[in-house]
């Protein structure tokens, strides 16, 4: 679209009959206009950019990041002898194409999917008239309207829609698979599985492909993650400023949402904020409870921020201009010590089993209330691996080896069984060639550190 058209197209246009052949030309002009106004093309805004400049974090090379991700996917597909991958998880589609469309809605309404050929094109099946939403990335070779066969669209005729959908997928596999009819699929309902099998297409575990592809982050991905964490921590600062006696948990949680969206972030996965007696046991969702002076306020961000990266941090604050009680100080010290000790253990070459066996755990009167995991991977969301306490390790817990480029979250929850309050702390840590680097920087509450 020329520069003059970019700013004025469609603003004063009158409805009139099209001349023969004009519709497709206009459609392409509309698509180019819409692509240039896509939120990914417009960027994250001056609030976020100014904070990133102040933090000294350079912009990631998004083209290099996208190429790296596609190569990671195709390496896994080749290693596992697949002709391609059929992806429904919106986060996997984001990883493959760096495009988004109604991410939460399509997570529970499968109306958008993507086929990544091991040696061939990326074909994105998107919501109707959404071709412009992937043009910015340069990764998608073709956009087609998706055939959705969820009951919302198909009703009692779903079986017919499944056949139409499967025929298109099978044709792609035969056209680009070089005779290989095996594909990896991340999420698929049984009707689709059965129909693809009837057409001779063999299915394998697409989650294994994508989780292993996403495991090792490129330098540009780490830059994007650093920026997401800076944005998250800026929103946390606004949240802490708003923390006064009398504010509701819901109002406080809304500050984190507002700060994330204002900086070009995307959504928050959970509602994990609790105060006072609601901090023990953990996993209360935030509520209308009014926070009181002297309360612990504990939260887990679980935030999908700028660039789609997860900033997964936890903090526990003390509400009001007060000093902590001895019990609060002791609980906080136990959690902070556990995080500090377990972070020092993270380095390349350590096995998952070795890591958990060396890890510090809650004391006996808090152990029954322990958090479900000691560590977990993180990237575009919580990712593989998830590492439990040593005593929770079972014969179906996968072992592995820590590698440079992985990012782990280190978890601690300390609350006595039957106690009044509890402490949640979580840090995000990059594994480097020689050890680790803590990516999260938000300070702990100084009053609680001092005890």
Regions found by a protein language model. Give the residues of each.
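Active-site neighborhoods and metal-handling regions in enzymes and metal-associated proteins
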Residues: 1-451
């Amino acid at each position: 679209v020329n520069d003059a058209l970019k700013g004025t197209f469609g603003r004063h246009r009158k409805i009139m009959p099209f001349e023969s052949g004009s519709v497709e030309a206009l459609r392409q002009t509309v698509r180019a206009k819409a692509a240039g106004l896509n939120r990914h093309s417009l960027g994250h805004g001056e609030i976020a950019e100014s904070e990133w400049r102040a933090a000294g974090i350079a912009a990631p090379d998004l083209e290099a990041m996208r190429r790296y991700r596609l190569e990671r996917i195709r390496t896994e597909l080749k290693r596992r002898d697949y002709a391609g991958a059929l992806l429904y998880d919106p986060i996997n589609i984001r990883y493959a194409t760096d495009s988004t469309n109604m991410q939460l809605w399509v997570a529970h309404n499968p109306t958008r999917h993507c086929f990544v050929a091991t040696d061939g094109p990326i074909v994105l099946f998107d919501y109707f008239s959404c071709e412009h939403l992937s043009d910015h990335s340069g990764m998608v070779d073709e956009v087609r309207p998706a055939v959705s066969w969820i009951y919302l669209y198909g009703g009692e005729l779903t079986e017919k829609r499944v056949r139409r959908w499967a025929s298109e997928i099978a044709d792609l596999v035969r056209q680009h698979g070089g005779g290989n009819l095996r594909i990896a699929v991340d999420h698929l309902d049984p009707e689709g599985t059965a129909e693809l099998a009837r057409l001779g297409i063999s299915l394998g575990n697409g989650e294994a492909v994508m989780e292993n592809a996403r495991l090792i982050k490129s330098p540009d991905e780490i830059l994007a993650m650093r920026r997401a964490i800076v944005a998250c921590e800026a929103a946390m600062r606004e949240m802490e400023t708003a923390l006064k006696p009398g504010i509701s948990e819901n109002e406080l949680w809304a500050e984190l949402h507002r700060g994330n969206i204002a900086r070009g972030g995307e959504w928050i996965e959970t509602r994990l904020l609790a105060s006072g007696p609601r901090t023990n046991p953990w996993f209360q969702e935030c509520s209308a409870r009014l926070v009181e002076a002297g309360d612990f306020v504990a939260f887990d961000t679980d935030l999908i921020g700028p660039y789609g990266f997860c900033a997964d941090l936890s903090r526990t604050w003390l509400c009001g201009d007060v000093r902590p009680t001895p019990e609060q100080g002791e609980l906080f010290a136990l959690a902070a010590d556990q995080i500090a000790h377990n972070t020092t253990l993270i380095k390349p070459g350590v096995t998952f089993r070795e890591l958990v066996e060396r890890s510090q755990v809650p004391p006996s009167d808090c152990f029954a209330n322990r958090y479900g995991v000691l560590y977990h991977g993180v990237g575009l969301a919580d990712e593989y691996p998830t590492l439990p306490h040593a005593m929770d390790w079972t014969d179906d817990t996968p072992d592995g080896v820590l590698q440079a480029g992985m990012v782990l979250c280190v978890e601690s929850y300390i609350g006595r069984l039957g106690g009044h309050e509890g402490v949640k702390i979580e840090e995000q840590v990059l594994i480097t060639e020689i050890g680790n680097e803590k990516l999260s920087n938000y300070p702990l509450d100084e009053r609680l550190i001092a005890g």
